[in-house]
């Protein structure tokens, strides 16, 4: 029922809704619920044996699909996932830059490593690239800074986490903005 609630919420505010899919069952459920956009998460992108069944499940389906970068800084894995989806006939593709695992303590939760999405843009100029500043920042106070850097680098959009009361969010509470904070940032 969660996907239907999400779809109802989107209708109530007049916005399209998106959700992450990691398996063919997720794809089937999202399509059945009428979800508008799908995304493949960073931990799925790293595994071609996970991406291929998702690509196969999307054959003949006209839905936008966004692909997050893999957790490790490997542009070939990212490109490989995008190419598998494209080969399956998914034409509405976008990439999401969410940063890379930081093996050393850093001010960011995930290292931005901006040169990788810049190289992706060089290789596939027509591919929209969205930035997920929430996952890069890891803390809400850094989200505006990361967002501005992404826009300065001509990213095509932002995927920002927002919650009415982030401190009680069930996941990633530290990186979520309150709606008013999101409004000010935008």
Regions flagged by a language model, labelled:
Residues 20, 41, 132-134:
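Conserved acidic functional residues
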Residues 39-44, 67-70:
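Short beta->alpha connector loops at strand-helix junctions that form conserved
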Residues 143, 171-178:
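Short glycine/threonine-rich loop-to-helix capping motif typified by GTGT followed
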Residues 1-19, 54-64, 114-129, 175-186:
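Alpha-helix-loop-beta-strand connector modules within alpha/beta enzyme cores
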């Amino acid at each position: 029922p969660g996907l239907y609630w999400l779809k109802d919420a989107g209708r109530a505010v007049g916005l399209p809704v998106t959700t992450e899919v990691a398996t063919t069952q997720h794809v089937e459920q999202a399509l059945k619920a009428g979800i508008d956009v799908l995304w493949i998460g960073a931990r799925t992108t790293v595994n071609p044996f996970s991406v291929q069944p998702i690509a196969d499940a999307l054959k003949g389906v006209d839905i936008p699909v966004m692909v997050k970068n893999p957790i490790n800084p490997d542009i070939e894995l990212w490109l490989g996932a995008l190419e598998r989806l494209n080969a399956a006939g998914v034409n509405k593709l976008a990439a999401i830059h969410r940063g890379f695992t930081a093996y050393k303590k850093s001010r960011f939760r995930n290292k931005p490593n901006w040169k990788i999405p810049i190289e992706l843009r060089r290789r596939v100029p027509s591919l929209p690239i969205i930035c997920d500043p929430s996952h890069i920042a890891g803390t809400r106070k850094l989200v505006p800074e990361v967002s501005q850097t992404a826009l300065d680098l001509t990213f095509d959009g932002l995927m920002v986490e927002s919650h009415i009361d982030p401190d009680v969010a069930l996941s990633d509470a530290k990186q979520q903005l309150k709606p008013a904070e999101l409004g000010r940032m935008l």
